[in-house]
Amino acid sequence: MRATPPRDDTYPSNENFKEKYPMSYVPIVIEQTSRGERAYDIYSRLLKERIIFVCGPIEDHMANLITAQLLFLEAENPEKDIYMYINSPGGVVTAGLAIYDTMQYIKPKVATLCIGQACSMGSFLLCGGEKGMRYSLPHSRVMIHQPSGGYRGQATDIEIHAQETLKIKKILNSLYSKHTGQDVKHVEKSMERDNFMSPEEAKKFGIIDKIITHRDIKLLKDKEQGQ
């Protein structure tokens, strides 16, 4: 029997995404040091500034990379905030939960910021950021819905996987309720079908705390001085 893990979206797999949109054109930045020049890919350079990107479909390989970055930044400075930028259509539930659990596990606060879209597990990670530090740019889109999956094989095995998907659904509803402040029944009803939201609607629902149009330099300086 072959069965796909529970997914919360209907988007293509990460392999198809990579084939269609090759990631080989990542910019390289040059930094001058006392020992000469040092080259970084742009994401590694931003990691030095404690910025993590969750971009594209969420699957196991991405989850491993994101959790490794979170753990590295905690080891480097457990008192300093981490900034997670999200532009994702969603993906595999268990991969998203691995990232979420690590966000809750580590000591640094994790601020989340939606750029472009935060759909399915992307919206789950967005609302799982530190309370008061969950942001969205003004023209981003947020979407929540219940998990889905495709299975085949013997009827008994299909039933087992269906029950597992229902358990995952219950867990996600409970966690969305925890982070948004919404009643579980309201969350379940809101996630029955694809539910697209503007940043204003996402804020009202409790997924984000603030819509930002410009970088708040004073806020960042105040946070740095408080650390």
Curated annotation (Swiss-Prot):
Species whose genome carries this gene: Rickettsia bellii (strain RML369-C)
Gene Ontology CC entries for this record: cytoplasm; endopeptidase Clp complex
Family according to the record: Belongs to the peptidase S14 family.
Annotated SUPFAM superfamilies: ClpP/crotonase (SSF52096)
NCBIfam families xref list: clpP (TIGR00493), PRK00277.1 (NF001368), PRK12553.1 (NF009205)
Catalytic activity: Hydrolysis of proteins to small peptides in the presence of ATP and magnesium. alpha-casein is the usual test substrate. In the absence of ATP, only oligopeptides shorter than five residues are hydrolyzed (such as succinyl-Leu-Tyr-|-NHMec, and Leu-Tyr-Leu-|-Tyr-Trp, in which cleavage of the -Tyr-|-Leu- and -Tyr-|-Trp bonds also occurs)
Known EC number: 3.4.21.92
Main location: cytoplasm
Keyword Protease attached: yes
Keywords attached to this entry: Cytoplasm, Hydrolase, Protease, Serine protease
Main function: Cleaves peptides in various proteins in a process that requires ATP hydrolysis. Has a chymotrypsin-like activity. Plays a major role in the degradation of misfolded proteins.
PANTHER family documented for this protein: ATP-DEPENDENT CLP PROTEASE PROTEOLYTIC SUBUNIT
Active site (record annotation): S120, H145
UniProt protein name: ATP-dependent Clp protease proteolytic subunit
A biological process term (GO) from this entry: protein quality control for misfolded or incompletely synthesized proteins
Oxidoreductase is among the record's keywords: no
PROSITE patterns: CLP_PROTEASE_HIS (PS00382), CLP_PROTEASE_SER (PS00381)
Compartments (UniProt record): Cytoplasm
Gene Ontology molecular functions: ATP-dependent peptidase activity; ATPase binding; serine-type endopeptidase activity
Subunit field text: Fourteen ClpP subunits assemble into 2 heptameric rings which stack back to back to give a disk-like structure with a central cavity, resembling the structure of eukaryotic proteasomes.
